[in-house]
Amino acid sequence: MAIQTSNLGYPRIGLQREWKKTLEAFWSNKIDEEQFLTTMKEIRLKHVKAQQEKGIELIPIGDFTYYDHVLDTAYMLGFIPSRFSEFTSYLDVYFAMARGSKDHVASEMTKWFNTNYHYIVPEYEEGLQISLKDNRPLRLYEEAKQELGVDGKPVILGPYTFLKLAKGYTQEQFATILKQLVAPYVQLLSELHAAGAQIIQVDEPIFASLTKEEVQQAKEIYEAIRKEVPNANLLLQTYFDSVEENYEEIITFPVSSIGLDFIHGKEGNLHAISKYGFPADKTLAVGCIDGRNIWRADLDEVLTLFTTLQKQVQTKNFIVQPSCSLLHTPIDKTEETHLSTELFDALAFANQKLEELVLIHSALTQGTESIRNELETYRNVHHTIRSSAARNREDVKAARTALKEEDFSRPLPFEKRYELQQVALKLPLLPTTTIGSFPQTTEVRQTRKEWRNGVISNEQYEQFIEKETEKWIRYQEEIGLDVLVHGEFERTDMVEYFGERLAGFSFTKNGWVQSYGSRCVKPPVIYGDVAFINGMTIKETVYAQSLTEKVVKGMLTGPVTILNWSFVRNDIPRKEVSYQIALALRHEIELLESSGIRVIQVDEPALREGMPLKEKDWDAYITWAVQSFLLATSSVANETQIHTHMCYSNFEDIVDAIRALDADVISIETSRSHGEFIDTLKHTTYEKGIGLGVYDIHSPRVPSKDEMYKIVEQSLKVCDPKYFWINPDCGLKTRRTEEVIPALEHMVQAAKDARSLLKTNA
């Protein structure tokens, strides 16, 4: 029996976020292109070497990127929109596509399947010349070979997933464009094979959710590629779910190895294998370590999985690997010594997961006796965390048991509530607001750092936050916004902030993961039962309201987003954790309301991303996700207006869920997706308050009043003006003050123009 260890992808950002810092230094012209490329190469090779030193045999090459691996593939295949044609250098084109420029709108960005990573959406245009513009995987393969002597495993995004993630073509064009991808993929694979690549990983995560017709279509493409590259050793890699529905066909694809996810698709993949077996002439790559969470593996469970597989499959060749790329986990837990022993011992970040793969490999090749001590350690760790007092709170259990049906609904229906709210709030037609955060300047970040390091006192820090809050309340009044926000200057991250103030959470010092581009997040760790402790947002919100006669809205992050943007305990269902968070937020919302706050926004930007990949599993998730939001928000008076916000999602799938949230107003990202949600509303009605974002806050460019007015105009064709709000796409935390103020002034002017037009037409 031949067994190898492999990794699907390694975190890009560096142990001290060197990758992020290098990118941002280059963007701000602090380093030149030569220094940028040199530093990036050093980081890239350091990551390859780290995996080699951990004992990984099949080391991924080409998973490293300057921004996003889907963007890399788009550039490589010539999917470069014509609006970027005036840029000549590779990096100028590449970063303009990713980030936009003063005069160019960036390509759309959206969630990578149901993760919190974002990819740049490839754009197809008529007349596009599809060809292999740059064999980047080959360059990086040869680099690792020459510099480190590592014969790596090139990783590429497969043609079917790539085109399915792209936009700009009609369904009728799909098959034609797909066939046009054969030639560049043949060239790419031929050159890699000729250079000596022993195995090439071709990622096709979309295979988890294809129809039978689509799988047949994909198979034909792989047959066409195989015909031209008969000797390349291809590993067809799936992840994020099982391929159960199409497994029988997928195992006949002309590839030498198939990778399956036995963490997030364990039940389905095992069921398919028990029914259809696995070909003797292929290698089974077993995703047996969770690539999306941070907990130590249950080694006994993994070894039992292999025992089951060895009984049911014909092959004698296995690859031991994570369930997906380790992009979604922090790099190393060694710096987290501040954590309690029971929690620290239970964690496994990327480097620890690689060590687990090597342990499993040892057990499979040399017998479990070879890792007897490690197995005993793992069993003790799991027992300790399971029996922890933090995971067994009686008060949390009692609150959950006491829930009644009426805890999940508002007293009056929306139309009646909204009438009462209009009387109470006295807002104009087409009210303007922002999504919540304002620029976190260098001064804001530096002052917070000084406070955390004990350089300044609590009192000095609070005075600084109050000064920033007052400054931005005045800015908002001068701009002419209708509903104001306090600016969130006290918050580093919209999830971390709440986690720090709730029981059941813990925080890493260096547990960073990439969200999009150079933006990294440090997800909280939900390790115990979640419970309310004290007010979390009351002081800052009430202070902001005391400064103005205008309405100030409270700002909270919703239960499902806190759940989906955290590393979550894996010993109870996610639904139960979500309900615990919702009950804690319910306390906070009641406190805000009793403190005189009449508009409360509960953001759920991550509602869509938590959906399972398979449509058959959607209803169960949506039901408890919606119930969690309702549990958090339903105890307020009818006169209190509940807002929510969502961004970066395929909203067409969840229009019914959005409606079921029963929020009085929802604001949605629409400008970057170039009006797709507006198109959705042409085919369905939405009869509650809604704000469709009028400008993309992820780009530094300041859009004109006319651009925003155009989106308002389009929106009012599908939305009732009585319920329509005007706002940016998302929070403004990452933008500069000199970008934010003119953009908001243009937005308010666009709103005034739209009001005038409505009055004229009336």
Curated annotation (Swiss-Prot):
Binds 1 zinc ion per subunit. Keywords: Amino-acid biosynthesis, Metal-binding, Methionine biosynthesis, Methyltransferase, Repeat, Transferase, Zinc. L-methionine binds at residues 435-437, 488, 603. Its cofactor is Zn(2+). GO terms for biological process: methionine biosynthetic process; methylation. The active site is at residue 698. InterPro entries: Cbl-indep_Met_Synth_N, Cobalamin-indep_Met_synthase, Met_Synth_C/arc, UROD/MetE-like_sf. 5-methyltetrahydropteroyltri-L-glutamate binds at residues 17-20, 111, 519-520, 565, 609. L-homocysteine binds at residues 435-437, 488, 603. The keyword Cytoplasm does not apply. One of its GO terms (molecular function) is 5-methyltetrahydropteroyltriglutamate-homocysteine S-methyltransferase activity. It catalyses: 5-methyltetrahydropteroyltri-L-glutamate + L-homocysteine = tetrahydropteroyltri-L-glutamate + L-methionine. Zn(2+) binds at residues 645, 647, 669, 730. This is 5-methyltetrahydropteroyltriglutamate--homocysteine methyltransferase. It comes from Bacillus cereus (strain AH187).
